[in-house]
Amino acid sequence: MLPVILNPLRLKTGLVGQGAALARRATLLAEAGIEVRLLSPDVSDELLTPLQLLFVAGLGEGEARHLAARARSFGVLVNVEDTLPLCDFHVPAIVRQGDLLLTASTGGAAPGLARALREHLAESFGPEWRGRVDELAAERARYRSQGLPPAEVSQKVRAMVVEKGWL
């Protein structure tokens, strides 16, 4: 596995599914700022072709397998919720506090552990981290505007975290 943070503004993303699984996935994508095209399970090739990512949730395995194969034939990366063999990528357990994004993944091997780790991270990095990230970003921008080299900027930001006792 290779963890990657994707810019949702650069992706054409589709979502196909039904029921509670579809609703959960739609919420997850909305929280990530992804503008998603909600498609029916019998989506046309014309609508699949421009996509780069396709999320499938709440469909039977046979239907999901067929849809995933069709999407892949157009170069679309596919995630079928809870069906590892049909996934080109996985979505980790997520804790989001403003711009701070923490994730935990077991590559699908132990979802319960990933969930427990997410809960632990959420307790350890609460809403106060939103302001902390903003504060650090402002200081970093100030240091960079002064023309400091990247290594020195990193050192100063790290020193600020230590000085404030955040970690």
Q: Where are these predicted regions, by residue range?
A:
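Short, ordered loop/turn segments at secondary-structure junctions
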Residues: 41-43, 82-86, 107-108
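Hydrophobic, well-ordered beta-alpha structural blocks that scaffold small-molecule cofactor pockets
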Residues: 1-42
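Residue-level detector of alpha-helix initiation sites
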Residues: 20-21, 61-62, 108
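Short amphipathic alpha-helix with an adjacent loop that forms part of the alpha/beta core around
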Residues: 43-50
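Short basic, glycine-rich beta-strand/loop surfaces that mediate nucleic-acid
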Residues: 52-59, 88-108
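An accessory alpha-helical subdomain
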Residues: 108-167
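ADP-ribose/adenylate-binding Rossmann-like module
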Residues: 53-54, 64-91
